[in-house]
Amino acid sequence: MAEAAPAIEAILAEYGELEQRLADPDLHADAGAARKVGRRFAQISPIVATYRKLEAARGDLEAARELAADDASFAAEVDELTDQIGDLDRALTDLLAPRDPHDADDIVLEVKSGEGGEESALFAADLARMYIRYAERHGWTVTMLGETTSDLGGYKDATLSIASKGDSADGVWARLKFEGGVHRVQRVPVTESQGRVHTSAAGVLVYPEPDEVEQVQIDESDLRVDVYRSSGKGGQGVNTTDSAVRITHLPTGIVVTCQNERSQLQNKARAMQVLAARLQALAEEQASADASADRASQIRTVDRSERIRTYNFPENRIADHRINFKAHNLDQVLDGDLDPLLDALAAADRQARLQNT
């Protein structure tokens, strides 16, 4: 851990500065700035706490060794403290491993139906509900930005904004960033009269939505803005005016829709926020080979062959093919009980980061 000393010193100094800023009433006059400082403070607090425990244990070990030199009964305490220091040292190494800079961010999540027609659209709706239920379990805020429904009430596509309310170091992105990819379902469709199991798929795309996206330069001449009549639920009159907005970024082909705000101006403003977040994510992807490799796991086309996860209804089984995770509680997972799976994905990611340091 000697090589980490400079990093620790820098973090301790930053921690002290953040403490002072959080105690300053003027900071809290700017809610955005206060949230940013609070999130960074929450991110480094576990590092500082673990480091202080490690230093205290080292001091205790030195004292125990001196006592053990005169009294053999202290030998057990020396062994116990040695083990404790080893655990704390490994924990600190883990905490100092490179973190995803977006872990504290909120997200935009898109669900798209793929091959399978109505069954795929119904499954896409099941996935959207799963993420909504998961967000509710964590006290997060979910906003439906736009959706296109199928004849049977499924989703051809749906776009959700999911935001946390606190300053946790691990925000929505930290938990749901692994969800991007093709999700495959095996079940008897409601349209199947012979009781045969069919396979279809839906795709999920996840993008971080940072607090600050001002650095993204968007040229108005690169945009095509279409307005149309909202098809979703909204305020009074939403179905009688062309309030929904679709923005196409011509250079990249990115399309963003928003239809659930009360006015066309509000829908356009929200769509521009989502577009800025997507363009920022795209720029970061292009700038980083590692990020590009990670993003490659997210779908470009919804093809049943490039799956990350399978939902098998006859066996009540869910299988994540990236980490060989299997569980027979599909009904609970679809009701938002995702934490065991997401914990396993996060642990695999953490191990990979440690191996690359």
Curated annotation (Swiss-Prot):
It is found in: Cytoplasm. InterPro entries: PCRF (IPR005139), Pep_chain_release_fac_I (IPR000352), Pep_chain_release_fac_I_sf (IPR045853), Prokaryotic/Mito_RF (IPR050057), RF-1 (IPR004373). It holds the Pfam family PCRF. Methylated by PrmC. Methylation increases the termination efficiency of RF1. Keywords: Cytoplasm, Methylation, Protein biosynthesis. The modification N5-methylglutamine is found at residue 236. It comes from the Bacteria. One of its GO terms (cellular component) is cytoplasm. GO terms for molecular function: translation release factor activity, codon specific. Its main location: cytoplasm. Peptide chain release factor 1 directs the termination of translation in response to the peptide chain termination codons UAG and UAA. NCBIfam families: prfA (TIGR00019), PRK00591.1 (NF001859). Belongs to the prokaryotic/mitochondrial release factor family. This is Peptide chain release factor 1. It comes from Mycolicibacterium gilvum (strain PYR-GCK).
